[in-house]
Amino acid sequence: MEFRKNDLVTLEIEDCGIDGEGIGKADGFTVFVKDAVIGDTVTAKIIKAKKNYGYGRLMEVLKPSPYRVEPKCEFARQCGGCQLQALSYEQQLVFKTNKVKGHLERIGGFTDIPMEPIIGMDELFHYRNKAQFPVGRNKEGKIVTGFYAGRTHNIIENRDCALGVAENKEVLDRVIAHMEKYGIEPYNEATGKGLVRHVLIRYGYFTKEVMVCLILNGNKIPKEELLVKSLCEIPGMTSITINVNKKHSNVILGEEIRLLWGQEYITDRIGDISYQISPLSFYQVNPMQTQKLYAKALEYADLHGQETVWDLYCGIGTISLFLAQKAKFVRGVEIVPAAIENAKENAKLNGLENTEFFVGKAEEVLPREYKKNGVYADVIVVDPPRKGCDETLLETMVEMNPDRIVYVSCDSATLARDLKYLCERGYELRKVCPVDQFGMTVHVETVVGLQRKDT
């Protein structure tokens, strides 16, 4: 049977796609349905039809799955932030485990994978210490802020995200009220006009410090002293800055930071290590789970106090300083100059003198230091962005021949690709542990321990 756009089909959802969508079949025709849960029987409308598969919109749940739960957030289906709120948390962990395992098998070609049980979350909501809220106008002309609907730049108005902290709403209420009172225009992506693009909020989970950064299509916000006074009424307010981004693009942050009040950073803690975090810093958004993630990375590194460690894609030194507590010496590499300045300050803040940090691309710095300066490593730790490691970097890692490699990944597909490269060149998979950093979403972190085969 041939299916066309707008056809209605009844499906039993038998599987789950990597983006959390339910998968069912009608007369052999596979349909991917957002918001459907494995075990559901649903009616879906075909919104896109290919030869052997299509995409459907959930119209009605005829028989709910035993794994289906009521989403906590009323915007769960509209917003692009949470893909799994309708799925029980136990099944979310099963989904994420299978996602990692499936990528390692299909892309990496691994069998008999030494998987440890996924490390789940205790607090499923209000765990995010950072949020970026776009600002715009709705169809009625009202200034709104919230999150983008899935696969669009249409703002779903929501100042109180279920994954964020309560301080987010307090900040946004004051910023929007200030804009309305003084006629300040939100940015319009289509025209490139307007002033306020985004509001970035960071929160120190352990210190309770609050940071507000206004991303502007300009240098100054009108009546800024009155806005600062209003924001300072929020308990914990520590840093108020402006980020200037005049580019006509959808890139959120520019490079220029201007301090309005307080200091340019907040401080937070993971384990025994304190970190200074600036508006541009990369810092894990779930500090409770990050502590577990880094503890697992430290376990896999198996440090005894005599090792030289390279930490690639080190950010503000989050993993580096964890490692420095146990290693003889740690060298970190990060492409963002401001992050390296933060890393150096964080090392001083924690009294760790056995560290050195380099600015540059990991795939350029490591080969240079190895080939020109003869550096070596007992252990290499990598925590790359979603695209994974550059092959030049992997090649140098293999040439350096460290005893152990620890790979921390936010994308199990590129992880599998890179592990295949390393394991074809003298390393073996010793341990794999998924860590749920992002409950209610499809994202999962993975820590992998690799050992050189001749040891």
Cite the ranges covered by each PLM segment:
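Rossmann-like S-adenosyl-L-methionine
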Residues: 2-10, 18, 223-234, 238-455
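Residue-level signal for inorganic ion chemistry
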Residues: 24, 39, 82, 199, ...
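Extended interfacial segments that mediate partner engagement and assembly in macromolecular machines
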Residues: 59-71, 77-186, 206, 221
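Short, aliphatic-rich beta-strand segments
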Residues: 201, 208-217, 274-278, 379
